[in-house]
Design a protein with these regions (language model features):
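Active-site phosphate/pyrophosphate-binding segments
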Residues: 1-21, 118, 124-128, 135-216
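Glycine-rich phosphate-binding loops that contact phosphosugars or nucleotide phosphates
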Residues: 18-149, 159, 213
């Protein structure tokens, strides 16, 4: 594991590769969902950098031809042990890409296989659960600013610094509402989450009883 900050990681990549053409986001399940805000941010703000997102095995078995030393591949797994994501990390490095992993666990296979690693919190509080997508978004912002410039760079950092405390402060207010919703819908076999386009990170339909303990 390296102890580099996000700014240091991106600066190191820029020093080795002055031109980056593509940023790929790779993960599975919830970790893939947590990468969507960063992908959406680059997609809507970058003028030159291209971006796309892949499930890990899609990346492994239908690898984009453009993955090379002009690519940054960002892989994400909470445990750092998701086999498909670890394999994607190895593959991306083999193809010459600059690979950054995002995980909660230092020393995990994802940490070991990536060129750079960003560690995040998760279990400490409700707010800490936002660290994974927040670190991915911060990384996307840093890449954009380093390679193209980003007018709202400082504002982004101010906002990201407030997220954890804001969520933790809101938890007492929303816990009773969440508990009531969970109890009233406990027997619902499926919970559908409606969405509209890119405004929501991923469409999900989940057995409600599976998420009940986390809801309350």
């Amino acid at each position: 594991m390296n102890n580099m900050s996000i700014q240091e990681i991106v600066a190191a990549i820029k020093n080795k590769q002055p031109e980056i053409k593509t940023v790929y986001f790779v993960g599975c399940g919830a970790s893939m969902s947590d990468l969507f805000p960063a992908k959406y941010f680059l997609e809507n703000n970058a003028k030159k950098l291209r971006t796309s997102i892949y499930t890990a095995n899609n990346f492994n078995y239908s690898t984009p031809a453009a993955v090379d030393n002009t690519s940054v591949v960002i892989t994400c797994s909470l445990s750092g042990g998701t086999p498909e994501t670890v394999a994607a990390t190895k593959l991306a490095r083999k193809l010459g890409a600059h690979v950054i992993s995002i995980t909660n666990k230092a020393g995990s296979p994802l940490d070991v296989e990536a060129e750079y690693c960003i560690l995040h919190g998760f279990y400490e509080s409700y707010g800490a659960k936002m660290e994974k997508p927040a670190r991915a978004l911060e990384l996307a912002c840093e890449l954009l600013n380093e390679y193209e410039g980003y007018a709202h760079y400082d504002d982004m950092h101010v906002g990201l610094a407030k997220i954890t405390d804001l969520i933790n402060a809101a938890v007492p207010m929303f816990r009773p509402v969440a508990k009531k919703f969970a109890e009233e819908n406990y027997n619902a076999p499926i919970l559908y989450v409606p969405d509209d386009g890119n405004a929501v990170v991923k469409r999900n339909h989940l057995p409600f009883r599976r998420i009940l303990p986390r809801t309350i």
